Amino acid sequence: MNMSHLLQNFANKKIITLVDFYFSQFISKKNSIIMLISACVSFESKNGHIFLPIEYFEKNCFFSISNKQFINKILKCLNKKKINWSLELSEHISCGDGSIITPLVFYKDKIYLYKIWKAEKKILERLYEKNQFDTIDTQQCLNILNNLFSKKKHDLQKIAVILTLINNIIFITGGPGTGKTTIILKIIIALIKNAKKKIKIQLSAPTGKATENLIEILNDKWLNRYLLKEEKKQFSFNPIMTIHQLLGISKKSEKIFFNKNNLLMIDILIIDEASMIDILMMSNILSALSKKTKIIFIGDHNQLKPVKSSSILKYICSYAEDGYSLKTQSILQEITQNSIINYKINKKNTSYISDKICVLKKSYRFEKKTGIYILSNAVYNKETKIFEKLFKNSIENVFFYEINSEIEYKKMINIIINNNKIFWRKIYEKKNIKEIIKTFKNHQILCIVKNGFFGVNFINKILEEEMYKRNIFNKRFYINNKLWYIGKPIIITENNQCLGIFNGEIGITNLSQKNTLQVSFLKKDNFIENIPIEILKNYKTSWSITVHKAQGSEFNNISLILPNKNLKILKKDILYTGITRTRKQLNIFSTKEIFIKTVLKN
């Protein structure tokens, strides 16, 4: 079997995608080595990798496969005892150093797709911009900090505010409960107080649901608390919108209205949930902004990688480990008046990036001894000893249910249905729809996958069938060939500006005053948006949703369902994201083997 047939076989077995296979054939139909390299680069870019180091090939890490049988098949096709991968790349026409357009770029022992190399270059050029040390008024900064924080208190939120004041681009990252929402508000206040002219502020996020969260936190209460009357005249807010709306990206053509030739006229851009942004989108954002625009990216770099391509936030935040430059440390000590700040000094030539990163560590949501905090940290750090406690159900507010048989599967469905008893009771008692929606949002089922017995589609179907059998709901309606009933939850899958509903929003089916079916959504300031079901488009049943769909949302209680097979999608980041969606209680349905294998996969 030659390399072309082998790669096609891998695509048929879904080890790689058809896109990876066709890309490899486009690059070379004869050279097995280049064929393999191009398939690997294409495959790994979708797994969050910006580039592949040459060691990836020297150590036979092809497609991150651990199966030795597959690795041996690849090596057999290559038919060489020793390969000079660098030489093969440098001699092939499809690969260059970036000075001219070629499908692959080989640069400093790293292999890129050209478009990703170009995007990285553009981002790094922006990061190379110097800090604004010369223009900083340290006394004014100190006054601003004292206005926002306790004088005695020293925490990383203070550092985040200072770094925002002295940089035109900054990345603030932190796990759940580390105060990312609060820091957005404090940064806005600090920037207004530090402004020498009227400033135009824009808030944005990757999804409609995330923008809704921003709308909820941005209120006059905060502004009135910290700003003087004159300071309130020093700024204006643009309407909060998604990144696609902000850049004017066409749904049909993907053309971008705002770009390097047509810049956005804003002074400050704050982007939340930045972990969802891929490298190409970040490049587009930076291209559409003047170098005078201050941009703040906020997110959790340990969460799920972007859906489309390479993960840029995680890549950038990895430089935080290099420490701050001496100059930045000196400024931090001077402004905070805290001589005990003793961060690692950057001895590498990377401070142009690391000086622009603040990693928030203290959790305000969880006490350190709470079960959710312990488990999320254990997953992140791969502390497998903690899992012995998990499997014995001796972690507070975390419950592990092993699903190894049909009986245990039925037990899982029963537990989930019982978790919604209060929700159904409030429907029977015809409680206020706001109360019903809030009750539903107390508990959410999360699945890793869409298909199969442990996927969203089947779980939703079997829950509806079981609830109907148990007479939990007894009236069923079929409208536009779809099943409806009072109490049916749905999640919006695409923004609809006309109806005022956004991707990720969850609504509950109920009767209108005219006795017709409608779906109600709880909006800002406890406002209810009622939509007749006949005009609803782009939605799905949401007894269970995917972890991807839940990213950026939080619930009091989560039931997290893992598939019973060791699928490619099962990795540490998706498990970490699922666990950290809950504030109070977590039910995990899985096998011990699958859970541990998932944690150990990056």
UniProtKB/Swiss-Prot annotation:
Source domain of life: Bacteria
SMART domains on file: AAA (SM00382)
Any single Pfam family the record assigns to this protein: UvrD_C_2
Binding site for ATP: G174, G175, P176, G177, T178, G179, K180, T181
InterPro entries linked: AAA+_ATPase, Coronavir_polyprotein_1ab, Helicase_ATP-bd, P-loop_NTPase, RecD, RecD_N, RecD_N_sf, UvrD-like_helicase_C
Gene3D superfamilies for this protein: P-loop containing nucleotide triphosphate hydrolases (3.40.50.300), RecBCD complex, subunit RecD, N-terminal domain (1.10.10.1020)
EC top class, as a word: isomerase
Reactions that this protein is recorded to catalyse: Couples ATP hydrolysis with the unwinding of duplex DNA at the replication fork by translocating in the 5'-3' direction. This creates two antiparallel DNA single strands (ssDNA). The leading ssDNA polymer is the template for DNA polymerase III holoenzyme which synthesizes a continuous strand; ATP + H2O = ADP + phosphate + H(+)
UniProt KW keywords: ATP-binding, DNA damage, DNA repair, DNA-binding, Exonuclease, Helicase, Hydrolase, Isomerase, Nuclease, Nucleotide-binding
Gene Ontology MF, one: 5'-3' DNA helicase activity
EC code: 5.6.2.3
Gene Ontology terms: biological process: double-strand break repair via homologous recombination
SUPFAM superfamilies: P-loop containing nucleoside triphosphate hydrolases (SSF52540)
Gene Ontology cellular component terms for the protein in this record: exodeoxyribonuclease V complex
Note: In the RecBCD complex, RecB has a slow 3'-5' helicase, an exonuclease activity and loads RecA onto ssDNA, RecD has a fast 5'-3' helicase activity, while RecC stimulates the ATPase and processivity of the RecB helicase and contributes to recognition of the Chi site.
Oligomeric and partner information: Heterotrimer of RecB, RecC and RecD. All subunits contribute to DNA-binding.
Family the UniProt entry places it in: Belongs to the RecD family.
Task of the protein: A helicase/nuclease that prepares dsDNA breaks (DSB) for recombinational DNA repair. Binds to DSBs and unwinds DNA via a highly rapid and processive ATP-dependent bidirectional helicase activity. Unwinds dsDNA until it encounters a Chi (crossover hotspot instigator) sequence from the 3' direction. Cuts ssDNA a few nucleotides 3' to the Chi site. The properties and activities of the enzyme are changed at Chi. The Chi-altered holoenzyme produces a long 3'-ssDNA overhang and facilitates RecA-binding to the ssDNA for homologous DNA recombination and repair.
Protein name: RecBCD enzyme subunit RecD
Gene behind the chain: recD
